Amino acid sequence: KFENRNPRGTLPAYSLLAGRYTIGACIAVDGEGVTYQAIDVTNAHRVVIKEYVPVTMCAARTREGAVVPRAGKEVLFKTTRMDFVDLYRSLVTLGRTEGLVTVLDLVETNNTAYAVREPDEGETLQAYLDAREEPLTQEEALMLLRPVVYGVEAMHRMGLLHRGISPETVFITKTGSAKLSGYATLGLRTADSELKSQMFDGYAAPEQYAVAEFDGKYTDIYGLGALFYRVLTGKTPVPANLRRMNDTLPPAHTVDKEI
């Protein structure tokens, strides 16, 4: 049961998307758009839906729910929407994969696109670590995060990059398994891009702080390395943009000689 109190400019609760998904509460807003709880009426399963409606490019919505780009932003909206569609279409093709939150469907309607995925289960890795009194051992870290590494590897084989690996985008399920969520297009994970960016300082790679630089598999490898640094040392890594100017990040083995 949902409360019909979604913010103005978002889809109203109980509206039906593509004849299949009942929109529920708005649960998050970022530079790419709006995320909703929802129900797949074909099987009564709960899902999460992300609507591509970037605040920097979209000004309004018609009475029928169609997204209206800002004047002068029409072409940019269309091209970045294509990035969103390409990403999530590939993730739908990838299907259920160890260590990844599953993307179930991609819907194109209302002059925009909607990514449908399974809900995030359990708690974030950040909450999990905060509840511990000490860092993980190397054995614990490998056992916990190995599925995430496999998931990132599967994305790379598809030609996809995650760009947002962090304790906030890894979820620990009730069974103790780790899953990576937080998929996003290049613009959301690059500073000073055409979108209002969402960066994870300490985990974002150096090239994510400059629109003129290229990312690659190494971007996610940096994020994984930073993630392991955090779980093994208990310390948040120094942001990459600051490390470029003056690298004050102590090597992990100097924080803990057992590493």
Which ranges hold each PLM region?
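AlphaC helix of the eukaryotic protein kinase fold
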Residues: 64-93
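Conserved short submotifs of the Hanks-type protein kinase catalytic core
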Residues: 110-124
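AlphaC helix of the protein kinase catalytic domain
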Residues: 125-136
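Protein kinase catalytic-loop region centered on the HRD/HxD motif
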Residues: 148-160
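C-terminal lobe helix-coil module of Hanks-type protein kinase domains
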Residues: 202-259
